């Protein structure tokens, strides 16, 4: 399956739709910007399990490692949060389109019982955050051979 980004001006599905209630809704709801919502929604995170660990990967383009927090809360809950800062604007700038998001994001994951939460490691490279949570070794049941008399 391939995904094709639509960028054709003549394609009605690639254009932003006008919403007559948009301005009414914005005047009633307190000031939260679309960018704040988009930043929260754009914190995409993959979680895979290997035989040794649970690995989380988050695409955080444009976010510095100082702007990201990785924590483990009570109850084996991994929390990845941060903030994507806005660029400084010059009053003479004229924006034609703003698609990159800024604002805060937070994601929570309940870790399984076998997670070693005291040994979590995190690293960031090229805008990708990798969090590794080691798993406790599963004790193999000890088998004791019983001699049969008789």
UniProtKB/Swiss-Prot annotation:
Conditions for induction: By heat shock.
Cellular component annotations (GO), alphabetically ordered: cytoplasm
sHSP domain sequence ranges: 36-150
Compartments where found: Cytoplasm
Keywords carried by this UniProt record: Cytoplasm, Stress response
InterPro entries: A-crystallin/Hsp20_dom (IPR002068), HSP20-like_chaperone (IPR008978), Small_HSP (IPR031107)
GO molecular function, one term: unfolded protein binding
GO biological process: protein complex oligomerization; protein folding; response to heat; response to hydrogen peroxide; response to salt stress
Tissue occurrence: Expressed in roots, stems, leaves, spikelets and embryos.
Top-level taxon in the UniProt lineage: Eukaryota
Gene3D superfamilies assigned: 2.60.40.790
Family statement drawn from the similarity comment of this UniProt entry: Belongs to the small heat shock protein (HSP20) family.
Known partners and oligomeric status: May form oligomeric structures.
Name of the protein in its database record: 16.9 kDa class I heat shock protein 2
């Amino acid at each position: 399956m391939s995904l094709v980004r639509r960028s054709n001006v003549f394609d009605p599905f690639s254009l932003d739709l006008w919403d007559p209630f948009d301005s009414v809704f914005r005047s009633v709801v307190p000031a939260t910007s679309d960018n704040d919502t988009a930043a929260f929604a754009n914190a995409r995170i993959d979680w895979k399990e290997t035989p040794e660990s649970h690995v989380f990967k988050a695409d955080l383009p444009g976010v510095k490692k100082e702007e990201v927090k990785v924590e483990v809360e009570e109850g084996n809950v991994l929390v990845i949060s941060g903030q994507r800062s806005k660029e400084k604007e010059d009053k003479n700038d004229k924006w034609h389109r703003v698609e990159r998001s800024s604002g805060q994001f937070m994601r929570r994951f309940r870790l399984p019982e076998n997670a070693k939460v005291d040994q979590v490691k995190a690293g960031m490279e090229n805008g990708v955050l990798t969090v590794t949570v080691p798993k406790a070794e599963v004790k193999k049941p000890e088998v004791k051979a019983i001699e049969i008399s008789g």
